[in-house]
Amino acid sequence: MIKTIVWSFIILVVLLPLGAEGVELKHIKTFQGAGAPKAVEISPDGGYAAVMNLEGMDFWLISTVTLEFIKKCQFARTPAEGWDYKAHQPIKSYAQKPVECDFSGNGRFIWISLHNAEAIVVYDTAEGPVVPNLLYERLKVTDYITGNSSEQTAIKIPTEKTPKVIKVTPDERYAVVANWHSSSVSIVDVQAYKTIKNIRVGGNNQYIPRGVAISTDSQKAYIANQRGGTISVIDLTTLGVIDDIPVTPNPRHIVLSKDQRTLYISDNINGKIIAFDLITKTKTKEVFIGKYARTIALSPNEKYVFGVSHDEGKLVVVDTTSFNIVYKEDVPYPMGLAVTPDGRQLWVTSYQMGMIYVYEIAGEPQP
């Protein structure tokens, strides 16, 4: 195995009193050298973390057990039109810029959105046979287990413009993709590797959809419209929008509680985490965590919600009962985060610094 991981333990920690809450994060490793890590997700079996490096145009697979690299997968580059989010105008770029991801087959398949490709890709971690008559993206894969490098492919599925968050339904029938610049959501047949419908959200209101959450029965998709300030509800049986619920001015990331009643929302510009009751359609709780609140995640026992403030460089832990911040830590430019299924690790990406921080979640009984 190649062991060339560069890591550091240089990080500032700000502890709030533990008191009755009893949660604490222990920093255990830092990975450096990522090209603008946008997102991190943990495989359903908890075995590995998948890191999406937007500007690096690659993704990393890292063991959650050994904290060693498993694979680095580099896309072959082709020119494409990108988007300058500060100047609000098109720019010259490349198609293969990974944004977000999800899984099927208990982590065997990784579903990845490509920012400038108007497409998503599916990578088979088991490197199974190529499926004929489909589109593909090319990858150079370095395997850190075998020490070998090889040319591989990932199935390419057209969507609409600027796909971002992608979620596979629990029954693995569909992948639901939010298309930022098309005001639409693509519904992809997971087995056929084909987009079967593009659903417009917001009518003529020019919504910007980003966050996606799926009900546990795979019957509904909730879409956070970052421009629009609403949650669009899609019926996954009829494949149509059945509701459009005003929630907060700038909803970015959403997570659904296990009882399907509470939707946790990050309000990006206003820097808040919000608890929203889907039955009464009312905001029940909110807490300010710092400007530009990005990704959020629930602990498996739903006692805590983890969140980051990108501009203020804060990682916070919020008690879901009191909705108080019970722990905070300084992290430079945090963007993505994910919790392992056993509730023992938290992974956080630092976008501008090109780092991924790994924490042990301590002081809290595991689910």
Task: State where each predicted segment sits.
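Predominantly soluble domains enriched in secretory-pathway, periplasmic, or organellar proteins
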Residues: 13-367
